[in-house]
Amino acid sequence: MAAATADPGAGNPQAGDSSGGDSGGGLPSPGEQELSRRLQRLYPAVNQHETPLPRSWSPKDKYNYIGLSQGNLRVHYKGHGKNHKDAASVRATHPIPAACGIYYFEVKIVSKGRDGYMGIGLSAQGVNMNRLPGWDKHSYGYHGDDGHSFCSSGTGQPYGPTFTTGDVIGCCVNLINGTCFYTKNGHSLGIAFTDLPANLYPTVGLQTPGEIVDANFGQQPFLFDIEDYMREWRAKVQGTVHGFPISARLGEWQAVLQNMVSSYLVHHGYCSTATAFARMTETPIQEEQASIKNRQKIQKLVLEGRVGEAIETTQRFYPGLLEHNPNLLFMLKCRQFVEMVNGTDSEVRSLSSRSPKSQDSYPGSPSLSPRHGPSSSHIHNTGADSPSCSNGVASTKNKQNHSKYPAPSSSSSSSSSSSSSSPSSVNYSESNSTDSTKSQPHSSTSNQETSDSEMEMEAEHYPNGVLESVSTRIVNGAYKHDDLQTDESSMDDGHPRRQLCGGNQAATERIILFGRELQALSEQLGREYGKNLAHTEMLQDAFSLLAYSDPWSCPVGHQLDPIQREPVCAALNSAILESQNLPKQPPLMLALGQASECLRLMARAGLGSCSFARVDDYLH
């Protein structure tokens, strides 16, 4: 038998070892991609950057009598096999992450060799590899020659049938209750071990010549239906969560949840929804309606790419805010530069009829400096470009033919008109009502409030808080540049070709001049506050767009995606709230963040139930 199964890796103890299936640093092979998809489906809670999953046997963590081949998945014995002192084992490349919850691998017996002294199981780091799994402390194994299980002892216990050539033995580790069971040819054999410690490695051991086994860590579908077993335990864990007792203080619990929902709606500017929710639940709103609408107006401008107008509106509604937040001002100005390249900021859209803002702000205007206040302006009407949404997909209602530069908005914009109704708070809490005018210095003037019909940023208009620009359609989180504004005179093989500013020389000069002023602002902030590497990187990324004739397709073109407006919008919104002594983050988001962090800590502590209590499972 030994001669018939000649040692595939005879000679050097490490002969036949390969690199573990890596593709030489290039693109992953189709097999590796399929493995990654299968592991992601089986173990979605595992962060493989922090805790990689076992994918192969380790060429560095084995006894010399073990040889590896076929991507370090095949194990063969190359020792003498005279007695138990010739036993040899190998561990997997990584321990089993606790975040798996349930972990499973299978081993196929390619050849039982001379005597079939094979062991399949688990072991901790540092356990002697000159032994079969299960013989030493923190080592566990199921042996093929007698069907016994070995739990950290040289004395085995009757467990299951023997196994031989052609059999497939599976090993399932339940990190929720600390147990392990085996399968043979797809059928469970029952619990083998209990009270298992954390951080165990899949392990196999061989002892006689000719023994060969192949491992399956997910490279191929398993014989055993592990996903059905996972569903069973997921239901148990989620049942525990749902059954958590709160009946004794149900009213208090509901009040907390209602306040969290209300504050979330207010934070993101869903004014009408927050008002309706407050009426239904009798929940007080901790901010005046006029102030919510002011923030809503500013967010809308940023999400539309009209950052220059957003800056001016912020300075008008909340004077001193940007002057006391130079980092925020610089972020906004860099974003404005990007939007000018994108053709969405009014500085390049309105060159033919310059607004007072354009004349006051550039060039040589102090408005770039955080030391100076706002300049007067009007807000452009967005009626022609206002987005709508169908089934969660944003689209534009602009009936005009698309050119690279949309016609400038009328100066008689309805968004600059004042509301005839005086602002009022909605179910405003008594404890905060006396301080409302102090905390919101300009929110109570009638010429700053805009009607609900114009300003309400409901979900149907802003899917997930992202507004679609004229040039980009957002479909399920992906961007399709199928409605790009192009200079009709610029054609490449019969197709429109995008150009910087649509080839408009005046707009290009406007961008260059603005860039010089932005550079001057960066230098000024450096002198006053010291060098800021984040500012330098932000500026370089923005300026790099000018190095390409088609910035949308360049290596830094991701900056032009509308989704990049979201972090800027969130930072500005949080700063406004913080300036009014309101939370800069909604409590609901803080609670979700805390829950996610608790699950990460559970995984690090080896508590496997964290895998089946993911926050995403409760977000609908």
Curated annotation (Swiss-Prot):
Biased composition (Gly residues): 18-28
Ranges annotated as biased composition (Low complexity): 409-436
Reported tissue expression: Expressed at highest levels in spleen and liver. Expressed in megakaryocytes and platelets (at protein level).
Example GO biological process: microtubule cytoskeleton organization
Gene3D superfamilies xref list: 2.60.120.920
Domain B30.2/SPRY residues, every copy: 35-222
Disruption phenotype: Mutant mice are viable and show no conspicuous phenotype. They have normal platelet counts and only slightly reduced proplatelet formation. Resting platelets tend to have a more spherical shape. Many platelets exhibit disorders in microtubule filament numbers and localization. The animals show a markedly prolonged bleeding time. Granule release is also reduced.
Oligomer status and interactors: May form homodimers. Identified in the CTLH complex that contains GID4, RANBP9 and/or RANBP10, MKLN1, MAEA, RMND5A (or alternatively its paralog RMND5B), GID8, ARMC8, WDR26 and YPEL5. Within this complex, MAEA, RMND5A (or alternatively its paralog RMND5B), GID8, WDR26, and RANBP9 and/or RANBP10 form the catalytic core, while GID4, MKLN1, ARMC8 and YPEL5 have ancillary roles. Interacts with RAN and RANBP9. Interacts with the HGF receptor MET. Interacts with AR. Interacts with TUBB1. Interacts with YPEL5. May interact with TUBB5. Interacts with DDX4.
Family statement drawn from the similarity comment of this UniProt entry: Belongs to the RANBP9/10 family.
Protein name (Swiss-Prot/TrEMBL): Ran-binding protein 10
The species this protein was found in: Mus musculus
